Curated annotation (Swiss-Prot):
Primary location: nucleus
Lineage top rank: taxon: Eukaryota
Keyword RNA-binding: no
Protein name as annotated: Putative zinc finger protein ZK686.5
Keywords: DNA-binding, Metal-binding, Nucleus, Repeat, Zinc, Zinc-finger
GO CC annotation, single: nucleus
GO molecular function: DNA binding; zinc ion binding
Zinc finger (C2H2-type): 110-133, 138-160, 169-192
Subcellular location: Nucleus
Length: 202
């Protein structure tokens, strides 16, 4: 039976690279040449090549969907809106899971606070507010900013609930939030007068 000497014991065993890892010992105990080891490595790399991109469109889309879903959940919890799944058969679990996912993904901005109606999308809410209430904008419930387009509103809500959410300064009298103390000072001067605000801001 021939004797074998392990040249690189720390390398992972692979059938394509066996020639580079194990060498038959002979009387002269010659080691393999560099070219045989490189050829074995090339064979190994050819076998393990992947056609999938490391960061594909589907990965980005999945990540964005999960991020939007988390933002919406936080919005629901903050506003105290409770969603229920009515009319779902308990026997059909697939339908129930799909319905739960759809209900969870419904954005909280579809709720009109003026007439307490719920709409299918934020664009429908914007149309409703423009026609019925003559207020063609969506208002942020945290900082009271107004937005005439839903894409602007959704981008703004990421500053409150997204992964890079900003910390805001809050007015003690009306509970409005501002991104810095200068905005809060301006709010004090305009809304509450310039009375004792220096003590509160310090």
């Amino acid at each position: 039976m021939p004797d074998f000497t392990i040249i690189q014991p720390d390398r992972k065993f692979d059938a394509a690279a066996v020639a580079g890892i194990f060498v038959r010992s002979s009387t002269s105990s010659s080691f393999p040449s560099a070219s045989s080891y490189i050829a074995a490595k090339k064979r190994k790399n050819v076998d393990n090549t992947s056609t999938r991109k490391p960061y594909s469109y589907k990965d980005r889309k999945r990540k964005n969907t999960e991020e939007i879903r988390n933002i919406k959940k936080k919005l629901f919890m903050d506003l105290g809106i409770v969603r229920t799944n009515c009319g779902i058969d308990n026997e059909k679990q697939d339908r129930e899971k799909a319905m739960k996912r759809k209900v969870t993904e419904t954005i909280v901005t579809t709720y009109c606070e003026l007439c307490e109606q719920n709409f299918s999308s934020s664009k429908m809410l914007l149309l409703h507010r423009g026609k019925v209430h003559n207020t063609p904008y969506i208002e942020c419930h945290l900082c009271m900013k107004l937005f005439s387009q839903t894409i602007q509103f959704n981008r703004h809500m990421k500053t409150h609930y997204g992964p890079n959410a900003k910390i805001y300064v809050q007015c003690e009298l009306c509970d409005r939030q501002f991104k810095d103390k200068q905005s809060l000072r301006t709010h004090w001067d305009v809304s509450h007068g310039s009375g004792d605000n220096q003590a509160v801001l310090a």
